[in-house]
From Swiss-Prot:
Keywords: ATP-binding, Membrane, Nucleotide-binding, Transmembrane, Transmembrane helix, Transport. Its main location: membrane. The gene is ABCG10. This is ABC transporter G family member 10. GO terms for cellular component: membrane. Residues 332-543 form the ABC transmembrane type-2 domain. GO terms for molecular function: ABC-type transporter activity; ATP binding; ATP hydrolysis activity. Pfam families: ABC2_membrane, ABC_tran. Coiled coil: none annotated.
Amino acid sequence: MELPVKAPIPGGREISYRLETKNLSYRIGGNTPKFSNLCGLLSEKEEKVILKDVSCDARSAEITAIAGPSGAGKTTLLEILAGKVSHGKVSGQVLVNGRPMDGPEYRRVSGFVPQEDALFPFLTVQETLTYSALLRLKTKRKDAAAKVKRLIQELGLEHVADSRIGQGSRSGISGGERRRVSIGVELVHDPNVILIDEPTSGLDSASALQVVTLLKDMTIKQGKTIVLTIHQPGFRILEQIDRIVLLSNGMVVQNGSVYSLHQKIKFSGHQIPRRVNVLEYAIDIAGSLEPIRTQSCREISCYGHSKTWKSCYISAGGELHQSDSHSNSVLEEVQILGQRSCKNIFRTKQLFTTRALQASIAGLILGSIYLNVGNQKKEAKVLRTGFFAFILTFLLSSTTEGLPIFLQDRRILMRETSRRAYRVLSYVLADTLIFIPFLLIISMLFATPVYWLVGLRRELDGFLYFSLVIWIVLLMSNSFVACFSALVPNFIMGTSVISGLMGSFFLFSGYFIAKDRIPVYWEFMHYLSLFKYPFECLMINEYRGDVFLKQQDLKESQKWSNLGIMASFIVGYRVLGFFILWYRCYRTRS
């Protein structure tokens, strides 16, 4: 990518960026096989053209709006300009200041705001922007706070700075304010280029105008290059737009000023109705307008590979800057992410307050049901064995309630790591470390009443070991859910997969079916069962050298080896979850 153009532009900013596409085309399908019928015959999926020979440009100190009817390719073009498309076949050229786009350099100077906001609902506006600044800037906390304060003033969010973001129907800031916060998250590193998908979508006319006016001020005062997609612009919003790229069926039918669009409609024989703005009418008749013809250009089918961008750039005589490093070390990232996660956990009722109450109340209720069962001679072993099986079922199955939180975190993680705000490793480490003390509190709230009320072995070492097992069970199940939340596409699929596996683990734990009765081809499930090892630990802790243990083929030495196996499950699921998340983020970033 070429060194920034230095030119006197509005607002005193010396560095400017111009984006340009030449004969840009984007196709999907064609090479992806699919089953064409019930017989399983393999056929090739039909290729679909999303963009065709798109040539347009976006200049500094201007708002360029990509418009067109639904399905015209607006979002696809914007994502390509942001370097976000990770699949499909792209040909043509994407130029930044006249040179082929270089991914790392371009990522450093640009900001991309998707249509869907991805914000933590329980953080305040100021906290959201502060954590974004701490993660993306090489600066001290004091300097980050000063920058965030200025940014909040610039965004007009002073009155809601200490208000929580909120989500959906929950109390929080308005839709327009939430949209400005999303824009602010991308502005903390002061990008020269801002790309926004549907900034006015879902907003009332006043909020939509407020957002677009804010963007216009940035072009005037700071000379930023702003590209946005828009679907239904009002008169006042249209006044803020400098250039329009009108698409129809993936082709450009107009690229220029609002006035030139008016002239094209006029010369095409159309009459703009009264009280209808020119762009709104142009979108309605886009299919009848003649596409702009451009000269053919040599295809660059390797779009999306930084190697190609770099080789093109170096061959053009440019100097490649290796500035794609992160702003913080892994340790610093873990500290910042851990602090943010801690606030989210303690403010999320279903994760902390509800979970703490659930553990305390469940411990008391179970203790009252199995009251002093440990002191009963007759059928005591059967009752205690059933008690151990039940509490493990309860503890392992109740962890699925954290799945929505993990899925929300994943969405934000993928968005933040796509801009290299931090490493995936730092997120996994912070998430793991934060849950260790939190689940310790939950385990003690559950274990303390239930252990003494049931009347299990009345010795301190027995209680401490029982509490340790409960704690590790919670950590193990939490890691299991975290791992599969990285894998599944949505909450419904996640619930189905996790519940199904938990049921299988319980079935093969050795409680319902003895190990020697399990078919050979299913024995691996016995050893993978999350129920097997804690169940054996609780039995050994209660009966120790009893003849009953020998009947169950259990040895007292397994008391600690089983804990080691459970710890390896925790590490294994976290490591597997890390690789799944890393691959997801890698695909998004590429």
